[in-house]
């Protein structure tokens, strides 16, 4: 009777072990497939997917923080001395992003307008929008450089007109005016003398195109046909490529619109088209990490992002170039001598930093980064940082430019930052981190259990003999 009980027990254990092995094996094979299917179903742009409402109205709180560079020695700069700068701010804005005119097309693409609305946050800022700062008179100094090649008599006329308008090389205006626009009779004067030189009327502000406006009509892939194409830009404002630059490679519209990427990312690089910089940008993988428990890949700007054509030949199309580390954006900024760079000329030619007083580039403060969840291609935490610079110099024939020594002068730098938090983070964590890892553990638990069960069964069988 003892032997029969043992036999029954060993058969039972053996069957239990086999069952565990079977379940574990199934999970091992099917688990990743189920997870993959779930991810695909939920990241494509489809009104029935989890991430659709998140894609439509981004629930992540975004902040725009702006630092101005005040010129402390404007009088001396006019005499040819080195500019001394003092960083003011940050002036922080809460940024709301949402999409309108969402239209699905037959070829698995969707088009939309992305809007940004900004609201000043006094409690997060160091100062108010009423603060006065001394900065270059952007329109006048920009126009002066643009008119350098014009006939002398025309420059003389402009110079006289500027005098009549009491225009000087530097201006003392409020943060609010410089950002959101100020009326300037100079705009009308330039439009009268040199029609078409500047394409705007009435008001001028550096961030006018940022607020209560959209960044152009994006048409992107929905991923319904091919998930590896999801979010990839098909066209921008109806264009398959832009024509700001001098090479077809530089004019290419690559990557996504900069909000999400295709899932199952490899730790190599990611690309997006930036309407603000008028070009595609490629960031490179730096390291893996975790953000609030969610695994992430960190992508950063390569040293070559704003390199000149000599140091990095593929960038030749963005020239005419100056030193490495600044990019001429005049072609997409109504031909004004504007340059973008990393803040404080981080990762740029040291001569740019040395040409002014008061810059302290550092990786911690001035490097941009994107932390993306590689399984879904959704960013968890990001901070995109850029600096706007104006090339100023003495322009003969325009007396207002004095004896200014040619310099790429930082005007301001800004960071657009956001990180996932609250209910959005919790839902994300549960569905895409917790459940997959539970499935992962279960397969090993079942497989792990099957071994002692089968061994026990075998031992009992042997003892029975």
Predicted segments, located by residue:
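Extracellular or lumenal secretory-pathway regions
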Residues: 2-295, 302-465
């Amino acid at each position: 009777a003892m032997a029969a009980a043992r036999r029954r027990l060993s058969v039972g254990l053996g069957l239990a072990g086999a069952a565990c092995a079977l379940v574990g094996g199934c999970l091992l094979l099917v688990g990743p497939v189920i997870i993959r299917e779930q991810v695909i179903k939920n990241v494509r742009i489809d009104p029935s997917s989890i991430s659709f409402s998140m894609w439509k109205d981004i629930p992540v709180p975004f902040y725009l923080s702006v630092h101005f560079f005040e010129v402390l020695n404007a009088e001396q700069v006019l005499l040819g001395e080195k500019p001394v700068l003092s960083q003011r701010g940050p002036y922080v804005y809460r940024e709301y992003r949402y999409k309108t005119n969402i239209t699905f097309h037959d070829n698995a693409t969707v088009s939309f307008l992305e809007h940004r609305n900004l609201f000043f946050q006094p409690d997060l800022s160091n100062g108010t929008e009423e603060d006065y700062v001394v900065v270059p008179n952007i329109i006048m100094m920009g126009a002066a450089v643009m008119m350098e090649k014009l006939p002398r008599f025309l420059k003389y006329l402009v110079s006289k007109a500027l005098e009549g308008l009491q225009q000087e090389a530097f201006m003392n205006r409020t943060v609010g005016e410089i950002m959101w626009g100020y009326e300037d009779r100079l705009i009308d004067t330039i439009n009268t003398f040199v029609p078409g030189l500047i394409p705007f009327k009435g008001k001028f502000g550096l961030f006018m195109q940022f607020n209560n406006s959209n960044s152009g009509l994006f048409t992107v892939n929905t991923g319904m046909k091919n998930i590896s194409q999801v979010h990839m830009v098909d066209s921008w404002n109806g264009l398959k490529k832009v024509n700001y630059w001098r090479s077809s490679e530089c004019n290419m519209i690559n990557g996504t619109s900069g909000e999400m990427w295709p899932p199952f990312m490899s730790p190599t690089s990611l690309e997006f088209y930036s309407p603000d910089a008028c070009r595609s940008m490629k960031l490179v993988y730096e390291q893996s990490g975790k953000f609030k428990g969610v695994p992430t890949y960190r992508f950063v700007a390569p040293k070559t992002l704003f390199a000149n054509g000599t140091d990095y030949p593929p960038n030749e199309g963005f020239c005419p170039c100056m030193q490495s580390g600044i990019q001429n954006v005049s072609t997409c900024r109504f031909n004004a001598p504007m340059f973008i760079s990393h803040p404080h000329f981080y990762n740029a030619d040291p001569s740019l930093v040395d040409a002014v007083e008061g810059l302290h580039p550092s990786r911690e403060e001035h490097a941009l980064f994107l932390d993306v969840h590689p399984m879904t291609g959704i960013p968890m935490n990001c901070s995109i940082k850029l600096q706007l610079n104006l090339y100023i110099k003495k322009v003969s024939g325009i007396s207002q430019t004095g004896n200014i020594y040619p310099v790429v002068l930082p005007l301001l730098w800004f960071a657009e930052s956001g990180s996932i938090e609250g209910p959005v983070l919790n839902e994300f964590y549960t569905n895409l981190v917790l459940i997959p890892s539970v499935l992962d553990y279960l397969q090993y638990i079942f497989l792990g259990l099957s071994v002692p069960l089968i061994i026990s069964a075998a031992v009992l069988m042997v003892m029975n003999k």
